[in-house]
Amino acid sequence: MRTARRWLPALVMCIGTLAGAGAAPALAATAVTGTSAGETQETADIKDRILQIPGMHFVEEKPYQGYRYLVLTYTQPVDHRHPDRGTFEQRFTLLHKSTDRPTVFYTSGYNVSTTPSRSEPTRIVDGNQVSMEYRFFTPSRPQPADWSTLDIWQAANDQHRLYQALKTVYGKNWLATGGSKGGMTATYYRRFFPHDMNGTVAYVAPNDVHNGDDRPYDRFFATVGDKACRTQLDSVQREALVRRDEIVARYQKWADENGKTFKVVGSADKAYENVVLDLVWSFWQYHLQSDCASVPATKASTDELYKFIDTISGFDGYTDQGLERFTPYYYQAGTELGSPTFKSPHLKGLLRYPGIYAPRNYVSRDIPMKWKPGVMADVDRWVRNDSTQMLFVYGQNDPWGAEPFRLGRNAAARHDFRFVAPGGNHGSNIAQLVADERATATAEVLKWAGVAPAAVQKDERHAKPLAPYDAKLDRQPVEREASLRP
């Protein structure tokens, strides 16, 4: 929820084509059976054990020292309310440590990476990790695509079925986790299936309870960082629109030379307005106060300004090609999740397209969208009143934290926690918390996973990750996405 890449639009993360609907095995999550004579549950090859589960399909295996890393698919109903109405193949990966270890269920809320990696909770508990691709992100998209089946309830059921299937092999404690939209996804999963997981760690997860009230974002941008940085960012954003005609001409030339088109948003000029509106949000989402020195002067050359805009917001994001990969996110933002808006008084007189900064404008018009009121409010009420053993981690300077999940009464008694990393951005994690909060968070994760050492159970200040840091496996760079997409 993160490999550095070309920035994509702010409202919002392939391997071949896999088998589609209709020809898949039965959907039942049946227990694993059939180990050969003399072969125990522990010595049986893990790939063979997984593939004995009905609906599992092997894609590839990649070597990684100390683990088995498998890429697989699992047959899921297109519609969990009507499982007879077709199936699709949902891609996931398995980082296998041991069936004697706890398992972390991770999702970014977008595509799944097929490069071995380990989330922070997985390192803390020294466990296995199942990473699932969110439905409708290719190749995990039903064919034909019935977009009405893309919602948080259907996605939670995807996780529930995969958990039920794999629990037959991985019988120890399970935790759910994810960052950004993945943190939202982990939270929604717990709301609909509160007893599947022993705990949930949600990183930088937005909570847009009232989509029509975005005043928290205005308050955030009025106070984030220091005044000098805020003022200069606003000045550069305004200058980007003052020089609009010159830069849009260059933008269109770049698009023509690189096969980029603007059919969905309507024109390069409309795309550029979105790119500029992303600028301040994207800066704080992915950068720190210490990066303010990189903001160019208002009188900088157009070349320098163009480069800064592309580096921070990214010109590719609002092209048809940039939007297509994230159509499922924009669809959800415009039907259930909500999306942020914010006032920009310093841009008065320079904006040409009122209302353009909205998810409906990033989804092809042949895909119908209808807002469902109350979906986020339901999750919010559940978190405040009924959730248990949940940890929310935010970054102080991350715009998405302006509307966080809030904990209700007796949160500590329910082992619910919310911590904020000082000065942190959209890549904030447990390791960046102040010492006492870091110890509490780490200790809780260990306890939920059932692997807290005696010393930690006695004094949480002794809590630390059980697995040593692996520079390759634990590298979690922030995925560069523009502001309207978490």
Where in the sequence are the language-model features?
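Alpha/beta-hydrolase fold active-site neighborhood
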Residues: 248-374
